[in-house]
Amino acid sequence: LMFSLEMPHQQLVMRLLAQLSGIDYQALRAGRIPEDKYTEYYAALDRLDSLDIIIDDSPAITPAYVSSTVKNHMADGKLDAIFLDSLNLMKSGIRIDRKFEEIDYCATELKNVARENNIPVWVAHQMNRGIDYRGNESRPTLADLREGGEQPADVVMFIYHDRADDKSINSSSLIIAKQRNGPTGEIPVYFRANAFRFESAAKARL
């Protein structure tokens, strides 16, 4: 189940097709699929259909709305995971004056949804803009999360690209900055920009 506050349903599906097929996103948008990519395209359509992804792009999503929607879907059949993009666009649904308090409230309520339904909840969240002005010291930390929200999280991960490294603009790191029940650290990854897809660095070298 995917709650998308960042982009509409159609745009999200197009990006998923690009990720699954490896076909250039702009080519998919324009309907110009290379003839030698039709096999990958139809395989991606079949794969997307088999994943049975439910996308909810309702505006002004609140924790209460997420909770009730999850319960309704759980009654119809088990959900494997919940994704939400993004935390900073959520509304609390109650009166909270300060934005960081609203973010913390929403994050805590989403944690409750995860525990009540015994299901993982993955939440995207923005970084503070100040990180862009730190030059070569721009490696993200928990303090860089915009308006907080990290306290209730079991795991916090960042995607980081060292802009001082000109060897490969697509080489990045998955930083595990917090893990309540496990180790932290970094994993090298490779970003295929035309398909909006991250891969393990080892796989990308093959």
Which role fits each region the language model picked out?
Residues 1-78, 92, 186-190:
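Cytosolic-facing regulatory segments adjacent to core modules
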Residues 52-56, 95-96, 127-134:
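Short, basic, glycine/proline-bearing loop/turn elements
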Residues 81:
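Hydrophobic "anchor" residues on beta-strands that sit immediately upstream
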Residues 92-93, 167:
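Extracytoplasmic/secreted cell-surface and envelope-processing proteins
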Residues 101-206:
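Phosphate-binding/switch region of NTP-binding enzymes
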